[in-house]
Amino acid sequence: MKHIDVSQLTQQFPLLQSLIALEPVSWFNPKATTLVEGVPYVGLDGSDVADASARLARFAPYLCEAFPETRASKGILESDIAAIPAMQATLNQRYGVEVTGRLLLKKDSHLPISGSIKARGGIYEVLAHAEQLAIKAGLLCEEDDYRKLFTDEFRHFFGQYSIAVGSTGNLGMSIGIMSARLGFRVTVHMSADAREWKKRKLRKHGAIVVEYAEDYGVAVEQGRKEAERDPNCFFIDDENSRTLFLGYAVAGERVKKQFDDMGIVVDADHPLFVYLPCGVGGGPGGVAFGLKLAFGDNVHCLFAEPTHSPCMLLGVHTGLHDAIAVQDLGIDNLTAADGLAVGRASGFVGRAMERLLAGFYTLSDQEMYDLLGLLARAEQIKLEPSALAGMAGPWRVAANLEWQASQGLNAAKMVRATHLVWATGGGMVPAEEMENYLASAHR
């Protein structure tokens, strides 16, 4: 990794001074372009997402057997979209800026199995790997009833193999729980930020948890090294995995169907804004890609990061991507938003998506705690701190009339806009832990 000359870089990119000072910033992306121009840089397209969607449909009968809580949705892991008008009124007052469109919450926080957005990509990649192994061994065909995977024969077969992953928490939970249920031996390398209850839950499901005193990057690197030593070990690489990315991307067509069912129109006169908390970038990157395929140029996706961990904003803004970490600027990467505590962004996601993202913003830990408390009070919905990162987004957009004008977004269009805040986790947080979160909120 070449040496970073911070003073030269801050001269070239003055916004970095605010990042270094840990000031909340908003940056609207001048590289953003149309779907047609941006998609070729991703290296994936709609057919890849359709393939992922078909694979999840094949596994749905198996998931019904393995996780009875998925039976109501026929083995399809999907979350509700809820209107949150009381929160909208509260925040219009708090921020002194009026968001005039409709405010909705995407409750990935309450997805079955692992209670976070990571149930999309993490579970999908484990299923894709299991399918590949079973087909290669002549035990499975795509036309089979996948319920046969929920048998001792298959558990014994998968028991010959292991899976490893590095995680700040939620990805590890999704991959650990899914891998163990299939019969794999699974090791989750957890960074210092990982919550204790997540480690306990993983161990209860039969996963091996290895703890590190360092951050996410170290946990991933150690997981990668362990997998290299064992030919039967598959490493799920959150920084570079196209399979994970596609698992998240399936969300786009699902949201489109939900909107159709809700009678919500998205077109040039009814824009859609989606606000996604961002850690290393795989989850929000994949979801944003799926949304762009579903809604084209009528959806504007923004990534939200903690002031202490603005890795994707830093990578895309400077064009250095994974060649720079927040620590290179003296930023500590210590945040209460454990799922977002990442110092170096995914180079794959940054390069793939930099032309398809409308903007980025940062907010403080205290702001996330305050939003957590306000949402619990206004709407009786309880989330973990990182899931609130997206909640400030509509007001960042509303405050920037210059950017709106550059996109042809006038007041009439903004009144008809839909703002979708992606709640990434928190549905499985233990009550005692949630009380601590709520106590950290300033009223």
Swiss-Prot record:
GO molecular function: D-serine ammonia-lyase activity; hydro-lyase activity; pyridoxal phosphate binding
Signal peptide: none
Database matches in InterPro entries: D_Ser_am_lyase, Ser/Thr_Dehydratase, Ser/Thr_deHydtase_PyrdxlP-BS, TrpB-like_PALP, TrpB-like_PALP_sf
Enzyme Commission number: 4.3.1.18
Keyword Lyase among record annotations: yes
Organism annotation: Aeromonas hydrophila subsp. hydrophila (strain ATCC 7966 / DSM 30187 / BCRC 13018 / CCUG 14551 / JCM 1027 / KCTC 2358 / NCIMB 9240 / NCTC 8049)
GO BP annotations, alphabetical order: D-serine catabolic process; isoleucine biosynthetic process
Pfam families: PALP
Sites bearing N6-(pyridoxal phosphate)lysine, chain numbering: K118
Domain of life, source organism: Bacteria
Family: Belongs to the serine/threonine dehydratase family. DsdA subfamily.
Keyword Lyase: yes
Catalysed reactions, semicolon-separated: D-serine = pyruvate + NH4(+)
Alphabetical list of NCBIfam families matching this protein: D_Ser_am_lyase (TIGR02035), PRK02991.1 (NF002823)
Name used for this protein in its record: Probable D-serine dehydratase
Membrane-crossing segments per the record: none
Keywords: Lyase, Pyridoxal phosphate
Cofactor: pyridoxal 5'-phosphate
